[in-house]
């Protein structure tokens, strides 16, 4: 009897103690939540942080992600989150504009800015056309399944209207040039619209891309000079085509398994394990053509120094390339922006040195005449 009463008393005390503890814990949790709410109400992001406390980023992808949500699919359709393609389209234009500058002068900054704007618009238009043609294929490839048209974020009709807007703005840029350049620029539209079809009918779609992407090598010179100089523009155009065959073959190795399954063609599937041999051949052809450009345009030592640096970069790129690792292919592909910038820098510095060499030659002639 006493044992049962004692046990009941113990159980009662235990129950009261647990109730008190849980009540205290509940009050403590309430205080903690209240403190958190007060902190959240008064919290302000520190410098370098976004609204959610994450580090701010000025990368193209971060800028697109911070844009109003309805605009984001259209910005991604233009590939503004991946600007490497715009750079690769723009850089041959800068080479041509730089080569067309008068000896001792910097390139025409107005033309550089005009062509930069045109590169953004035409690359966006080209990507829109490409995604419209390839929407059914893109759904079957892991890397491209999230593209706006393939994912259903933008309808075919809206993408067509958006394409019209981009081409209209690009036409406005083109009309700022001389008549020769307007006609030359308009001629590139055939290449822009047909390139996306090439991967269905030939193993050389990268060649078609090279013909399209390097049109600025012709257009930049004509925009400055009024017409093309074949001795400079044609080898420059050829070198750009070889360059595109290099970087886009590397790029194509990212999707070679999916492409083989769905029946698309590329130089990556054509060259297979011989890819590095082909890339080496394209590199030699590219450097040879750029050397001819230098001779025909009277380039000076900085230009040829830049070509040596480009050769070293290409050799390292090809030697270290792992064609079976998509991450490495993307890294090597994007590094080609550096190659384009080195060539542009070599052209600018080489052109600035032309005036010094001309002055030295003039002084030597005058000294000989005096003697």
Curated annotation (Swiss-Prot):
The chain crosses the membrane at residues 84-104, 109-129, 172-192, 201-221, 232-252, 278-298, 301-321, 333-353. Residues 1-45 form a transit peptide. Pathway: Cofactor biosynthesis; ubiquinone biosynthesis. Pfam families: UbiA (PF01040). One of its GO terms (biological process) is ubiquinone biosynthetic process. Its cofactor is Mg(2+). It is a multi-pass membrane protein. It is found in: Mitochondrion inner membrane. Residues 46-83, 130-171, 222-231, 299-300, 354-371 are mitochondrial matrix. It is an enzyme of class 2 (transferase). Keywords: Isoprene biosynthesis, Membrane, Mitochondrion, Mitochondrion inner membrane, Transferase, Transit peptide, Transmembrane, Transmembrane helix, Ubiquinone biosynthesis. It catalyses: an all-trans-polyprenyl diphosphate + 4-hydroxybenzoate = a 4-hydroxy-3-(all-trans-polyprenyl)benzoate + diphosphate; all-trans-decaprenyl diphosphate + 4-hydroxybenzoate = 4-hydroxy-3-(all-trans-decaprenyl)benzoate + diphosphate; all-trans-nonaprenyl diphosphate + 4-hydroxybenzoate = 4-hydroxy-3-(all-trans-nonaprenyl)benzoate + diphosphate. GO terms for cellular component: mitochondrial inner membrane. Its EC number is 2.5.1.39. GO terms for molecular function: 4-hydroxybenzoate polyprenyltransferase activity. Belongs to the UbiA prenyltransferase family. This is 4-hydroxybenzoate polyprenyltransferase, mitochondrial. It comes from Bos taurus (Bovine). The gene is COQ2.
């Amino acid at each position: 009897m006493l044992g049962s009463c004692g046990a009941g008393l113990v159980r009662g005390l235990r129950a009261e103690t647990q109730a008190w503890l849980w009540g205290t814990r509940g009050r403590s949790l309430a205080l903690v939540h209240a403190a958190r709410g007060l902190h959240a109400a008064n919290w302000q992001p520190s410098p370098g942080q976004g609204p959610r406390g994450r580090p701010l980023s000025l990368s193209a992808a971060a800028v697109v992600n911070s844009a109003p949500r309805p605009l984001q699919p259209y910005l991604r359709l233009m590939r503004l989150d991946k600007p490497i393609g715009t750079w690769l389209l723009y850089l041959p234009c800068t080479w041509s504009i730089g080569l067309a500058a008068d000896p001792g002068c910097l390139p025409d900054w107005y033309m550089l800015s005009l062509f930069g704007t045109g590169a953004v618009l035409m690359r966006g238009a080209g990507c829109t056309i490409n995604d419209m043609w390839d929407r059914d294929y893109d759904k079957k490839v892991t890397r491209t399944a999230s593209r706006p048209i393939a994912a259903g974020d933008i309808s075919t009709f809206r993408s067509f209207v958006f394409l019209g807007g981009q081409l209209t703005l690009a036409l406005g840029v083109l009309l700022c040039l001389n008549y020769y350049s307007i006609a030359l620029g308009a001629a590139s539209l055939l290449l822009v619209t047909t390139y996306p079809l090439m991967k269905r009918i030939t193993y050389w779609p990268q060649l078609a891309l090279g013909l399209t992407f390097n049109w600025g090598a012709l257009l930049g010179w004509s925009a400055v000079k009024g017409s093309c100089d074949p001795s400079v523009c044609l080898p420059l155009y050829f070198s750009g085509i070889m360059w595109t065959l290099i970087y886009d073959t590397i790029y194509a190795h990212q999707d070679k398994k999916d492409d083989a399954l769905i029946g698309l063609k590329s130089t990556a599937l054509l060259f297979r394990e011989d890819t590095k041999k082909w890339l080496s051949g394209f590199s030699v052809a590219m450097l040879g053509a750029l050397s001819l450009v230098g001779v025909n345009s009277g380039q000076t030592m900085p230009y040829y120094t830049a070509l040596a640096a480009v050769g070293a970069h290409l050799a390292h790129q090809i030697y270290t390339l792992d064609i079976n690792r998509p991450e490495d292919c993307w890294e090597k592909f994007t590094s080609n922006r550096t190659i384009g910038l080195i060539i542009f820098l070599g052209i600018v510095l080489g052109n600035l040195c032309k005036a010094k060499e001309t002055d030295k030659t003039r002084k030597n002639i005058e000294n000989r005449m005096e003697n």
